[in-house]
C-alpha cells in the first residue's frame, strides 16, 4: 500500500539521483529554516538507520550510538558549561579584587582566598590580613589618609578602564557577535533563523574572556544573560560533532534549547528554573524529549559547577538565603507596592534603553563603540568608588541586601541598637531600633539606587557582553531593602498601630528586610524580562522553601501586570524588534479580523505572482526569472491558464540543480525544457535534451484558502514553523504568504513600521 | 483593506442571521472538537468584548471582569481542590483507624487525634492511650490473646467489606464515571474528546465520597490519581460558571489542564511537580499563559491544604524526608539496579493489568463488578491483616520505609544493635549490625512485596476509584528498603572490601536505607507511568534538596529505558488504547513512509467521496445524503466534474440549518435548491425559493496534497488539533482524512487492530 515510487515528500530529495548534490538542504545566512522539512529529513535519516541496523551488528551498534548521541551531547554541554561558569566566577573574583589590591603570597589569589591562607583567620580580622595589600600600601606604603584614598581611587579607575578597553577591543577585532546578552538573538535563532558565526567557537572564546573583563571592570552589568549565550555556543560546538545534529537545523535547535537551560542553571544554580526559563522564555520548539534532556544537561552543569566550588561554600545557588521568621498577611501590601515599582522600573528601563539603542543605531554615536565603553566605564568607576554599595561587585551587593541580620553580622546594614538587657540568641533576634550605620546605609543605598537606574540604561546594549539580570535585581534589591527597613522601623516604633498590633509585639522578630530585598529583586527582574513561572521557580530554588513563594509570586504578578499595562514587550522582544529579526512570538495574540487574501502577495495592482510551469519553461526562462526576482522559491503550476498548483521549488535548490545539470549532465543547454512531472513532456524531434527537476520539487506545499482568517494563518506559521504558505481559491493558486509578510502584517496591525522587519 | 463582507472564517457563523440558531458550535457526545475553530471562536468573542468595551464604562468593567475571570477560576479551583483534598485526608485517617478501633472521647477522632487529647502524651506511650479502644477491648473487654486477635481480625475484614461494598454500589448507582483513576480519560478529554458527565457534579461528589471509602477499606490503591480527576471536576464546575469557558471547549480545556496541576499539587504537596505533571503527562494544548495560571492554581491548592493541615505537622508534602548523610558514587550501582527493577515491574504490571482488564471487558467477569470488588477486598483484608506492613495504610508504610532511622525511632525496622560504649548523638548514627527486628521486618517486607505486586494488578481497573501512584511507590519502596538494608549490612560487615573501603569506615554512617526506598519508589512509579521530569521534580520537592536528585534521576532514567525496551506505552496510554479512545499521543513518533494518499478515504475500489455541490443540490438530495451516510461533514465543491474545493460543511450544522429553515423560512420545500455561494444561482422561473447556507460553510477547510508524507499529516493533526483534513491533487478534491483514519492508520502500522479505535 505504500506508494514508494511517488514518495517525494518535502524531505525526500532522492528519487532521481542516489546522492543529492552538495549543499542541498542547507540554508543561507539570515534566512529562516523550514521546520516541517527539517523534521521530515530527520525522520528519513532515522528510518534509514533503523532499516540498516538490521543488516549487521556493526550497523546495529551504530544505530545505538546514534540513539545515545543526544544524551552524550547533553553530558558534554553540562560539563563544559559548568566548567566555564566556574572558571568565569573564579576569574571575576580575582580580577574584581585586583582593582583594590593584590595578594602578596600569590598574586592570583583573590582577597578572600588570600586571607584564608593567612593565619589570622578569626572572624573579625578576616578583612584585615597582612598578606592582602591595597595598592596604596604596596606602592606608597600608606593604608590610611587622603593621599592613600586618592591613589586607591585612581588605581580602581585605571584597572576598570583597562579591563573595559581590553574587552571592547577584543569584541571588535575578533568576535563582533560576542556583544550584548545574546538572549534576543538566541530566541530568534531558536525560532528558526540562521545567523552564521553567532554561536561559533570564536564567539565562545571571546565572550568568555570579555565577560570576565567587563564584569570585573565594575560596569553595571551581569554575567547571567551572557552565560546563556556561552552555554549555547557550547551546545552548538558539541552538536557540530554529531552528524545527527550538525546536518539538521531543527535537531540542532533542540540541543540549543537544552544548552540555554544549562546556562541559566549555572548562572543561578537553579536547574529546574533553568529548564523552565528555556521553556518559557527562550525556546520555540520544545518537545517533551527535549524537556527531559534539558533537565539532564542543567543538572550536569549545576553539579559540575558545584564540584568546582567557586564560591568556596559548596552552595549551588548564587544567593543562598535563610530566613528565620514567617511573613504576615499585612506585609502583602508593601510586597505589592514593590511589584508596582518593579513594573514601573521595567517600563522605564525598556523605553529609555530602546530609545538610547535606537539613537546609537541611527546617529554618529554608533561609530565610536570603544570610546563609548571607555566613557561609560570611567563615569561608572568615578561615581561608584566613593559609595561602598556601588564599589563592591553587584552580586556581593545583592547578597548582602538579601541577608537577614544575624547576631554576628558586622555589616553597616545590621547596625541596630541592641537592648543591653537582652542575651543574644543566634537566630530570632527581635526587631530593634536602627543605629547610625543603618541610617548612613539608607542614604548610600538611595544614591546607589539612582546611580544604578541611570547607568544601567546606558550600559545595556554597548558593544561588550552585558547581562541585565544582576543590575535589575540590584535595583529591586536596593529598593526592597529600603522599604523593608522602613517597614521594620515603623513596626518597631508604632507596634500599637492597628495594622501592626496583631502580628508585631515588642520583642518579636516580625519584619525581615532581606525578604523585601528579595521580593523587590524578583519584581524588577520580572518587570524587565516579563518572566513568570521561571522567575518564581528560580527564586524558589534560591530560598529553597515554599514558605516565601507567595510574596514572590504576588510581586511578580503585580510587576508583570503593571509593566504590561504600558507595553507588552519585554526587553528581549524589544531588542528583537529593534534589530528587525523575523521572530514570530508565541505569546503575541493576533486578534485582528484580516484574511489571508489581505496579506498575500501579489497585492491588487501588483504584477502577477512569479510561477514556474510544470513542463513548458526552458532553462533560460528560469534563469532569467531567478535573476530578475529575489524570491526564495517559486510555486509550480500545471499551466499559466489553469493555475492549478503542483508544488513548490526553492530558489537555492533551483540554482544548484541547474548549475549541477549544466556541469554534469550532457545535452543541457539554455533552451532545454525543464519539467517537474514524472514523465518528460512530448517535445519536437530536434529539441534539446530536457531537464528533469522533480527531485527538487516539494510536492506537498502548504496551502490555505484566501478566506482563511489571519489568526489561523499566524497559528499555522507558529506551530508548524513554516517559511511560506500558498494561497488558493477553489483550487487555483492566488498568491503566497511568507513569514516576512506575516510579520509585516502584524507590525502594521500594531501600528508599527512594517519595514522594520528586515530579514526573511 | 479588511474584506468584512467575505469574513466567514471557521469561527464566524453570522454573516447572514444576526443570531445563530441554538446548538450551533456545540459538539455531540463522544466526538472530537476542532481546536482551530474553538480558538477562532474565542478570538471573535474577545474582539467583540474589546470593541464593546470602548462604548461605555459598564462594558469596560465587563471586559475587565472577563479578562480577570481566568484568575478567579484558578483561585476557586485551588481553594476547592485544596479543601477537598484536606477533607479526604481527614476522613481517610479516621475511617482507616475505625477498622481497628474507636475513640471513646469522640468517635470522630482518629487514633492519633484521640491520643493527642489524652493526657499521657509522652513519646513512648503515645500509641497506648486509654481513650483509644480496639474493637476487642470495646466489645469483649480483651486486649490480648487469640480470641481478641480473631475478633479484631474479623472486625477489620467486616469494615473493609462494608466500605468497599458502599463504594462500589454508590459508583454503580450514581456515577459510573467515578471509577478508575480517571487520568486516561482526562488525557483524552484534554486532547479534545467530549465525554459528557465525566467531569460532572455527580462524578465529583461520588468520586470524593467513594475515594474515602476505598482508601479506608485497605485495598491496594491510592488517592493521588483520583484526586486529579476530582480537581478536574472542580475545574469543570467552575468553568461552567463563566461563559468564556463554558461556551468554548478549547478554553475549557485550558482550565482543566490547570486543575490537573492543582490535583497533583495537593496529592503530593508538590506545586511545581504538579504543573510539570500536567504539562508532561496530561495536557495536550498547554500555552504559556496556562502554565502561569496552573502554577497559581497549584499554589493556592497547596496552601489551602496546608492551612487545613490534615497531617497535623504543617508540612505541605505527603512524605517529608530528611537524610543526614550524602550518597556515594559506588551506591549508583544499587540505585541503577533498583531502576531496572522498576522498569521490569512497570512492564509486568502493565502487561498483566491490561490482560486482566481485557478479560474483564470481554468475558462474563465484567458483569459482576460488585462481586469482584467484594472478593478482592475480602482477599486483600484476609491476607493483609496478619502482616503489620500490609495492615497499616499504604502511605504510612511508604512514610516508614522512607524514614532514616533516628536515635528515637522505635520502629521494628530500626531495631539495630547499638554499641553500648557509644553515646547516642541525635543525628549521624553510624552503621550498626541489624537486630532481630530488622530480620523479621525483612521477611515481612518480602511477603508484603509479593502480596502488593499481585493484588495491585487485580485491583487497578475495578469499578471503584483507584489510583496507582501509591501502590507502585509502595512496591518500589519495599524493594528499595530491602536492598538498602542489604547494602548497609554488607558494608558494615565487610568494610574492608575494595568497593566499601573508600567511603565506609567502621563507625561511619555510610548507607541510608531510607534513600534506597525513595529511589525504588521513584523507579517503580516511573516504570508504570513513564513520567520523567515531573517524577524527579515531585521527588525533589519531597526531599527538598538537590543533594539526592542524582540517584533519583539515575533510577528514573534506567527504569524508563528498561520499561521502554519492552513496550513504549505507559499504563495510561495502555488504558486509552484498551478503551479505544481517539487519542493522538504527542510522544509517539510516526516514522513510516506512507503518504496521505494511502490513508485518505475513499480507498481504491470504494464508492466516491460524498460531496455537496455549491449550487445544484436540492434540500431533499442533501437530506437523503445525510440519512444514508454517517460522516461528520461534507466537502463542498464547485461541481462534480471539476471537483474544485470550496469549503466544508458540518453534518450537525447542516441538519440544524435545514430544520431551522424548514420551520422558520417561508417557501423552503424539499426540492428547494441549496446554495453555498454569495449570490443565488440562476433558477427557472417556477422553481421554489432557494436556501442560502453560506453561513454554515467553513470557507477555510484544511487541505494537504496527496503526496504529503503521513508524518507531516500526523504532525498537523497533533499541532493544530484538526478533526479532518481534505486531500487534493493539483487543486482537485481527492478524499478526506479524519482523526479516526489517522489513528487507525497508526494502529495498523504498529501491527495493532485498527478497529480498536472506536470513536471519531
UniProtKB/Swiss-Prot annotation, chains A, B:
Short sequence motif named Selectivity filter part_2, residue ranges: 222-226
Reported impact of residue 78 to S: In MRXSRC; marked reduction in outwardly-rectifying currents
Annotated residues for binding of chloride: 181, 469, 572
Region (Required for localization in the endoplasmic reticulum): 14-63, 667-696
Selectivity filter part_3, short sequence motif: residues: 467-471
Positions marked as site (Mediates proton transfer from the protein to the inner aqueous phase): 281
GO MF annotations in UniProt: antiporter activity; ATP binding; chloride channel activity; voltage-gated chloride channel activity
Protein name: H(+)/Cl(-) exchange transporter 4
Record lineage: Eukaryota, Metazoa, Chordata, Craniata, Vertebrata
Gene symbol of the encoding locus: CLCN4
